[in-house]
Amino acid sequence: MMMALQIFIKILPIMFFGILLANLMCHLNILYKLQKYIKNKYFPIIAVFFVSSTSGSFLLKNLLKKGEISEENLLPIYFLGMFVFGIHIILFYAIPMATSLGWYVGGIYVLIKFLVTCNYLIISVLMLKKRKYNIDIEFKSKSEGLYGAIRDTFKQYFRVLTSFVPSVLIITYLIEHGLLDIVEDFAGSLLNALNLSPTILVIVLTGLATISGAIGIASGLLDENILSPNEVLFSLFLAGF
């Protein structure tokens, strides 16, 4: 279970503080205060999605229940939020990874991640323009204070854990008990023909559970010189699909 433990140590604290920050922004009315100075009708949702896609999804769900957005508006706003969260992933995961990959390989990785992320923005803009959505969301709700922020943080965090933790535990357990050897029997010859190490399957299989876990394992394998930068880059793209 050492592999799972390493993933949890790297990912779970980041996930928790991201959700906590998003809830603090909502419950302490930080978004409403900032909205007075930043005149953009999408800003509150963008701000929440930037720190946590989980909290952003919960926010949209609550706004839908309250009737502040319609079901027609939900999808383009969600795509807009996922574009912003994609920028978060690039800033806090892709770019730090790229520094260890080198300027050439790392630059290609970040560029492709950015271009893929831009698809969310393009889809959102086209839907908003074509259907002439008129979305104007402003946070005027009464603040629930620090208690409300902490309460919702743990509520959302444990919901994520119910899927994240079992997935990582199952995948890493199977890897540590021979799954990789079985997979290598089928794909090893092909990967060797491509001058790739079968070890990249560790990253790819982890990506089936969580791409964040795949990035964490990739950085560890790169630090220990088990995989080359090109192999890490290739495996991360496979894991992303």
Curated annotation (Swiss-Prot):
Provide GO CC annotations from the record.
Answer: plasma membrane
Q: How does it sit in the membrane?
A: Multi-pass membrane protein
Q: Which family does it belong to?
A: To M.jannaschii MJ0871, MJ0880 and MJ1556.
> What is this protein's name?
Uncharacterized protein MJ1589
| InterPro entries on file | MJ0871-like (IPR038880)
Key words, A-Z: Cell membrane, Membrane, Transmembrane, Transmembrane helix
| Locations listed in the record | Cell membrane
Q: What is its main location?
A: membrane
Q: Which residues cross the membrane?
A: 1-21, 43-63, 75-95, 108-128, 160-180, 200-220
